[in-house]
């Protein structure tokens, strides 16, 4: 019924997969679909950060290999859950483009943000297990969290500042020792669980961050808060991932 309502509102013909007899096209498709792995799959432009944007031809092999080698970086817990992602970065950028292919490969449910201004509300609706971000977005989240926490006043502000101080000292793999981890557990229950709920990230398992350098304090804060941030580096020409950290191979 929802599809019927949508069809009534658009001017273009609308087809639903259930109404199509795709099997009748199988032999016809086999006769002309001959895609070589080295053929161009997409033509994208670089961001122009260090010079004039240039066009980049990426082959099917480029993208497929990037997908296959990126999947092991997904925390294993995600593979056994309903995998929901929120997409807000432009798909004309290779970072988001490749991840969309990856999402389809593993059967993820993709939710699209309405706009940059509604990301917080969209996170609340989607309740994603993973989403992609850029450092500027995480910076805005961080600034808003700190401002609200300190504005609470009294005991609440004191507890928040204590938790914030702990978070900014976070080190991966329990390097700060058992006493620190015990205190962090308390901070997560008292403060950071509320932060995750406010951001719509109760179910989050990974935030893939790229396109610019991530400030160490942001990495420490969000990881301490139970919002794992994985920072990647890549180029349009490398389709795009070159390196990414993860808790599969510990290290920050």
Q: Residues of each region from the PLM?
A:
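Structural core segment of the AMP-binding/adenylate-forming
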Residues: 1-23, 30
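Adenylate-forming
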Residues: 3-10, 55, 66-73, 138-152, 193-202, 216-220, ...
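Conserved pre-ATP/AMP-binding loop-to-beta segment of ANL
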Residues: 25-45, 52, 78-84
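Conserved S/T- and glycine-rich ATP-binding loop of Class I adenylate-forming
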Residues: 40, 46-49, 85, 90, ...
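Conserved AMP-binding A3 loop
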Residues: 41-67
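Conserved AMP-binding/adenylation subdomain of ANL enzymes
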Residues: 64-84, 91-189, 203
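Conserved ATP-binding loop and adjacent catalytic segment of the adenylate-forming AMP-binding
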Residues: 180-182, 203-209, 214-252
